[in-house]
Amino acid sequence: MRLSRYYAPTLKETPAEAEVISHKLLLRAGMIRKLTAGIYTYLPLGLKALNNVAKIVREEMDRAGALEILMPAVQPADLWKESGRWDFYGRELLRFVDRHDRESCLGPTHEEVVTDLVRHEIRSYRQLPVNLYQIQTKFRDEIRPRFGLMRGREFVMKDAYSFDKDDSGADASYWGMYEAYARIFKRLGLKFRAVAADSGAIGGSFSHEFMVLADTGEDTIVACPACDYGANVEKAEAICPPAGDLAPCPAAEKIATPGQHTVEELAAFLKVPVASVIKTLLYVADGKTVAALVRGDRELNEVKFKNLLDAKEDLRLATPEEVTAATGAPVGFAGPVGLSLPVYADRELALANDWVVGANAADAHLLHVDLGRDANVVSYTDLREVAPGDPCPKCGALLDFTKGIEVGHVFKLGLKYSKALNATFLDEAGKEQFMIMGCYGIGVSRIVASAIEQNHDDGGIVFPPTIAPFEAALINLSPKDETACAKADEIYAALTAAGIETLLDDRDERPGVKFKDADLMGHPIQLTLGGKGLARGIVETKDRRTGEKGELPLEGFFEAFAAWRAGVREGWGLE
């Protein structure tokens, strides 16, 4: 492809709307343009990168035995009501009513649709297992779409769904997809980690997220340097030390604490450690107010708390008015003693007594509180977020914390949807059984953005060769010189014939403009041909990842180039 005939409108300045580096560079490199909030048009360069990702995803899905289909984007409400997710999914589900007053939604995911398909087609165990996938545009009505392709309302996703006759088969399907995902991200040239994760609104018995490692990632990954343990911070288990004998605790005592609203203020006022204070946090779940207790120096893990409550709607902090109605006190003075609502405590709190808690009265706290004696706690369970210094739940080594971007998620769904939608088959004994399901998602468009978040520099994008719209940029510095143009055309034809996607910059522009655009667009390989190089019989090279420059001879160019290119790809961990 010749850049003089290509639509690649690069920008010198970063649009004010762009916050994260991938959004900035995708706009500046002429890969996407915003239509409206969270919805983008893919320009030729962006679409080529998207298609390159989809190609590898499709190849590995096919290799794993999954079969490609294409399901409708519009889904009837009846299916979602049958599964129970119509009310549970929340406002991210874009709902509408057609001219016949039929309720529908734009699909953010397709568990209901694919289960409905299979339940009408599969009758016997002989038809199982089956694994169906699609690559399709999805829609989620994000409340605050931002970060370009990272968190848009419309996005391209690969979603696969497996159906098995028994648990062992479902496990085999799950781990088969897990391995396929690992191959995909390796082939894409990305640094990634698979971690245990919460199943969220999709549901299921267990799941893993595939995270692209990036300092700008929204997710925190907890990993053990000594074993294979890894988890999203939402899922990571917080380990308690062994319980010991507790000394007797004096009777609870109410004291005045005027103006001490936070645990830090209170601890300083009382001259006690923050860790001796209990935070009482009031939440509303499914219309009911509940309390969660964690140590003053800990943070509540809201995902763990929501899962404990099996909350159908989003968990939210109680408003100041709701706190006062439940406790009789303003925010900052709530406590578990005498509280007439369900109280749940982090299990760490059972290991000690003599706590400081709110007195459920303005400007007052209680000293010497023993939760077992003074409060009515429904249960003690793991409710806190893991923190630096916490041990690995598998081997006891101290955990490491890194940032990542979720680009893939695999779920073992079990019977969640097959039971709800009555997807059954007849087993070997002629007995009706529910199919056991798994689902597996990859954010195809998100991978493009994540690759940039992981791989960029001051000059622009640094794409891995398997994602880059063009693996090579051939820059002709002398577009008015017939000899230079003829040699550039010759090299371009040889590269193209060898299956190497190449962008020939034949524009009548200054060299500096061409070099800056090549860096900005992220071509992994840069080849430069100019009058001086022609005179010397060489082509200049640049490895975009390392910035290393070199030369290749025009005589026997392609053989020398093939060896050099292999080294560039090896640097990305590619064959």
UniProtKB/Swiss-Prot annotation:
Biological-process GO terms, alphabetical: prolyl-tRNA aminoacylation
Subcellular localization: Cytoplasm
Pfam families xrefs: HGTP_anticodon (PF03129), tRNA-synt_2b (PF00587), tRNA_edit (PF04073)
The EC number(s) this enzyme carries: 6.1.1.15
GO molecular function: aminoacyl-tRNA deacylase activity; ATP binding; proline-tRNA ligase activity
Coiled-coil parts of chain: none
Reaction it catalyzes: tRNA(Pro) + L-proline + ATP = L-prolyl-tRNA(Pro) + AMP + diphosphate
NCBIfam families the record matches: PRK09194.1, proS_fam_II
The protein's role, per its UniProt record: Catalyzes the attachment of proline to tRNA(Pro) in a two-step reaction: proline is first activated by ATP to form Pro-AMP and then transferred to the acceptor end of tRNA(Pro). As ProRS can inadvertently accommodate and process non-cognate amino acids such as alanine and cysteine, to avoid such errors it has two additional distinct editing activities against alanine. One activity is designated as 'pretransfer' editing and involves the tRNA(Pro)-independent hydrolysis of activated Ala-AMP.
Subunit comment: Homodimer.
Record-linked HAMAP family: Pro_tRNA_synth_type1
Domain comment quoted from the record: Consists of three domains: the N-terminal catalytic domain, the editing domain and the C-terminal anticodon-binding domain.
Family: Belongs to the class-II aminoacyl-tRNA synthetase family. ProS type 1 subfamily.
Protein's UniProt name: Proline--tRNA ligase
